[in-house]
From Swiss-Prot:
InterPro entries noted in UniProt: Domain_X, Maturase_MatK, Maturase_MatK_N
Keyword Manganese: no
Taxonomic placement: Eukaryota, Viridiplantae, Streptophyta, Embryophyta, Tracheophyta
Family: Belongs to the intron maturase 2 family. MatK subfamily.
Keyword hit for Ribonucleoprotein: no
Chain's gene name: matK
Species of origin: Equisetum arvense (Field horsetail)
Protein name: Maturase K
Length: 476
């Protein structure tokens, strides 16, 4: 559920009505406006009478929500109400559906405010678009020394989740209610194996991952590592400035020469994450492999109340090794350039190394995807897609059009375009074979009539219109 300006404005208006809004989040669940927002169905501002029948779908309505809220307000024994309500499956499903969505919105809005304050405090510059990953790595990772590849575990115990919430939320009533629904949902979804995963269909439980578990992890990583880098630079700045004292004092100079650590004032750590896969890169300093793992494990154990297996960590030297992320295989190579100095008598040749960032991807992954969808075989040979033969020619060409555009925009940041040319070849001939199978003709005839007008590369250069000219005229 995406936070919008309208939801934030509503959150501020409701918070003003609550007496202890700085300490308690539980009273926010008793405001009917939250359930209007969570259903993505807004009532006209001139008519805020929620007693009228406003149907959400075929089964639920806001009238049922109001009755449930009134019952909760008038209860003297919440435990008895929960037991009686759970006996009625219809009331239980409605209570879970709306109350969990309200919990989701309260947590999401609360975290949004906390994240904005955190970004200002630790000078966090974040980019939330997946399409900016390639350009970010090209620009920032070229000067990185070491890479930490981390896989966040998909599962978390409910009590560990409550402990994470307790660090930011001090409202005991809100925490008890959250604990009840988390344990209840865990018991219901044991057979379905949908507990605390990144599955988009599981909207009621993924809020714990998307908004608290990952947020707390990123918060500790950014804040603590920022403090570590600042202390690291200040403590080792003496090695870079006082060069005369090192030369005069042999003992100290020998000590400083034995330490090969050289730190830069612009030292920083770059962080990239997609779902449960995150990459951390150090720039301006070297960090021992065991120190990386020990530091992250301590954060996980003492702050997140979790234990992560060491095999989920892998450290690599970016100068020698490459890493895989989001279908890309990022690596760096040093290109040797010859520089000749100009002089009157002699012209010696001086060699200098220029670091150049190299982006490459393996051909296996796109071909596996195309083979799974039926566009080619395992070896990459194009085949016809029989399920599309019942569609019209325009629909077939438009479908291939969309697939090619998705591949191009995803892998468009590659320096070497060989992978794009291979995907283009597979899609073009798969499209031709599909049309040939539909018209019961040969690929050569279809290619001359229709596919000869295809110009994928030239169409992509257009700035205003990205529609490809796959089809001209109709062929019966």
């Amino acid at each position: 559920m995406k936070i919008t300006d309208k939801k934030l404005l509503l959150f501020e208006n409701i918070s003003k009505k609550v007496t202890y809004q700085q300490r308690f989040l539980y009273p926010l669940l008793f405001h009917k406006e939250f359930y209007v927002v969570t259903s993505d169905s807004f009532i006209d501002k001139s008519n805020m009478n929620l007693s009228k029948e406003f149907v959400l779908n075929d089964r639920y309505s806001f009238l049922v929500i109001r009755r449930l809220i009134n019952r909760i307000r008038n209860l003297n024994n919440s435990k008895k109400f929960i037991q009686t309500s759970l006996s009625d499956k219809s009331i239980c499903s409605k209570l879970d559906f709306y109350l969990l969505k309200a919990l989701n919105m309260v947590l999401e809005t609360f975290l949004l405010i906390q994240s904005e304050q955190t970004k200002k405090r630790v000078n966090w510059k974040s980019y939330k678009s997946i399409f900016s990953t390639c350009s970010f790595v090209e620009e920032k990772f070229i000067f990185s020394n070491q890479i930490l590849d981390l896989k966040i575990p998909h599962f978390i115990h409910p009590e560990s989740f409550i402990r994470i919430l307790r660090q930011q939320i001090k409202d005991a009533s809100f925490l008890h209610l959250t604990r009840f629904f988390v344990h209840e949902y865990k018991e219901r979804s044991k057979n379905e194996k949908l507990i605390y995963s990144f599955n988009k269909r599981n909207k009621f439980v993924t809020f714990s991952w998307n908004f608290f578990y990952i947020f707390e992890l990123e918060f500790f990583l950014t804040s603590l590592l920022t403090r570590f880098i600042n202390n690291l630079v200040l403590s080792n700045l003496f090695d870079q400035i006082n060069l005369l004292e090192k030369i005069n004092n042999n003992n100290k100079s020998q000590f400083f020469l034995s330490e090969k650590r050289i730190y830069n004032q612009n030292s920083c750590i770059h962080y990239v994450r997609y779902q449960n896969h995150c990459i951390m890169a150090s720039e301006g300093f070297y960090f021992h492999d065991t120190n990386w793992i020990y530091y992250i494990l301590n954060i996980w154990q003492f702050f997140m109340h979790l234990w992560i297996q060491p095999f989920r960590f892998s450290t690599k030297h970016f100068q020698k090794q490459s890493f895989f992320f989001l279908g890309y295989q990022f690596g760096r190579e040093s290109k040797l350039l010859k520089v000749r100095s100009i002089s009157l008598d002699k012209s010696p040749t001086i060699y200098s190394r220029l670091k150049k960032n190299l982006l490459k991807t393996q051909i296996v992954y796109p071909i596996d995807f195309l083979a799974k969808e039926g566009f080619c075989d395992i070896s990459g040979y194009p085949i016809s897609r029989s399920t599309w033969t019942t569609s019209t020619d325009e629909e077939i060409l438009l479908n291939f059009n969309k697939i090619w555009k998705s591949f191009y925009f995803y892998y468009g940041g590659l320096i070497k375009k060989d992978i794009l040319y291979r995907i283009k070849y597979i899609l073009r001939f798969s499209c031709a074979k599909t049309l040939a199978r539909k018209h019961k003709s040969t690929t050569r005839v279809v290619w001359k009539k229709i596919v000869s007008d295809l110009s994928l590369s030239s169409s992509l250069r257009r700035k205003k219109n990205f529609h490809f000219v796959f089809f001209q005229g109709s062929h019966g």
